[in-house]
Regions:
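The feature captures the beta-strand-to-loop junction immediately N-terminal to the Walker
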Residues: 33-35
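Conserved ABC ATPase signature
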Residues: 132-136, 140
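ABC ATPase C-loop
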Residues: 149-150
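Catalytic Walker B motif of ABC-type/P-loop ATPase nucleotide-binding domains
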Residues: 157-161
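C-terminal boundary and immediately downstream tail of ABC-type ATPase nucleotide-binding domains
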Residues: 120, 204-212, 216, 221-250
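Helix-to-loop junction immediately C-terminal to a conserved catalytic motif
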Residues: 48
Length: 250
C-alpha cells in the first residue's frame, strides 16, 4: 500500500527528516507519533508532494513512486489528506463542505454512495447536513474535514493531528470514526503528538524524534520501550494509561 524508504528532507537548509522508513499495509491503521517539530507533518506533506525530498523513495499502489508527482496527481492515485488546519467554509453547509471534492467529478450512483457512507463514519454529522460551516464547533469541523478527505473514496487516508486542540469529550468520537473508517477498507496513516490518543486497535506505531524513527512496532510494545517513555512521557499504549479501546464497528 505505502512503503517509505530512507526518506530525507531538508527545509531551509536544515535536515528535518533523516533517512526514515515506514510502511502502511492495505486496511491498516498506523500512527506516527512525536513531539512538535519532530518531523511528522513534513513526512505527510512530502508523501503528498508538497515537499521534495533530498533522498529516498515513496512507493505505493503497484510500485508507483510518488516522488516528483504533483499533489493533484497523487490525490488521483487514491490518497486522501486532511491537514491539521483544514478549512471548513462557513458559507457552505456541512453537506456541501463534505461533497466539495466531488463537484468536478461525474455524479454517479457510486459517487453518491461514497458520500452517504461518510455519514456512517461520523453519524453525528447526519443531523447537521444543512447547518452552515460557520456554526460548527472545533470537533465538528474536524469531523467535516476528515469526512471531506473521504469523499472520493481514497485507498489511503493521511491525517495530520486529528485530535489536536480538541476537548477530551470529543476525542473518543474521533477515535470511533477512525475505527469506522477502517471497516470500509481504507488504510489510514496518522501523525499524532499525543501518544495517549493512539487506540489499542492501531496496527502499528512509529515514534519519530528529531527526524529519526526511534521505535517501530505494535503499540503495546511501546509501553516497555524506555526511549518512547523519554520522548512522549507517561504511559505508552498498552500500559495502564491506555484508556481508549477498540469501539464496536458500524
Amino acid at each position: 500500500m505505502l512503503r517509505v524508504g530512507n526518506l530525507t528532507v531538508d527545509v531551509q537548509g536544515s535536515r528535518v527528516l533523516r533517512g526514515i522508513s515506514f510502511e502502511v499495509k492495505a486496511g491498516e491503521l498506523v500512527y506516527l507519533v512525536g513531539r512538535n517539530g519532530a518531523g511528522k507533518t513534513t513526512s505527510l506533506r512530502t508523501i503528498m508532494g508538497f515537499r521534495k525530498p533530498a533522498a529516498g523513495s515513496i512507493i505505493t499502489f503497484e510500485s508507483v513512486n510518488l516522488i516528483g508527482l504533483r499533489p493533484y496527481r497523487i490525490a488521483r492515485l487514491g490518497i486522501g489528506f486532511a491537514p491539521e488546519e483544514s478549512e471548513v467554509f462557513g458559507e457552505l453547509t456541512v453537506a456541501e463542505n463534505i461533497a466539495l471534492p466531488t463537484w468536478t467529478h461525474p455524479q454517479t450512483r457510486e459517487a453518491e454512495a461514497r458520500i452517504e457512507r461518510v455519514y456512517r463514519v461520523f453519524p453525528q454529522l447526519e443531523r447537521y447536513r444543512a447547518r452552515g460551516g460557520h456554526a460548527l464547533s472545533g470537533g465538528e469541523r474536524k469531523m467535516v474535514s476528515i469526512a471531506r478527505a473521504l469523499a472520493l473514496g481514497p485507498k489511503l487516508l493521511l491525517l495530520d493531528e486529528p485530535t489536536e486542540g480538541l476537548s477530551p469529550v470529543i476525542v473518543p468520537a474521533i477515535i470511533q470514526g477512525l475505527a469506522n473508517i477502517r471497516t470500509f477498507g481504507h488504510a489510514v496513516f496518522i501523525a499524532e503528538s499525543n501518544i495517549h490518543h493512539v487506540p489499542d486497535f492501531a496496527d502499528r506505531l512509529y515514534v519519530i524524534e528529531r527526524g529519526e524513527i526511534v521505535f517501530a512496532g505494535a503499540p503495546e510494545l511501546a509501553a516497555r520501550d524506555p526511549a518512547v517513555a523519554r520522548i512522549v512521557g507517561g504511559t505508552a499504549p498498552g500500559g495502564s494509561g491506555a484508556a481508549i479501546e477498540a469501539p464496536p464497528a458500524v
